[in-house]
């Protein structure tokens, strides 16, 4: 089944204004896609960094025990 083309009703716009409006919408959609991809990558990087920090905290942890002796 063939889909019908979308219809844009813009009676107050010239063709050039409508093309410019559509161009801005396309640019915004592309920018949004890029931003979402960048956010996902940053979240992935943050998760890896948090794991590294956890591992380093374990590696750097000190366990100190002291024996206290009292004079007799």
From Swiss-Prot:
Protein name: Uncharacterized protein YdfC
Organism of origin: Escherichia coli (strain K12)
């Amino acid at each position: 089944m063939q889909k019908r083309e979308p219809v844009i009703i813009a009676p107050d716009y010239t063709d050039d204004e409508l093309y410019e409006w559509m161009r801005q919408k396309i640019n915004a959609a592309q920018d949004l896609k890029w931003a979402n991809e960048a956010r996902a990558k940053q979240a992935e990087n943050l998760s890896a960094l948090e794991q590294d920090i956890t591992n380093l905290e374990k590696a750097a942890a000190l366990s100190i025990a002291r024996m206290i002796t009292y004079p007799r």
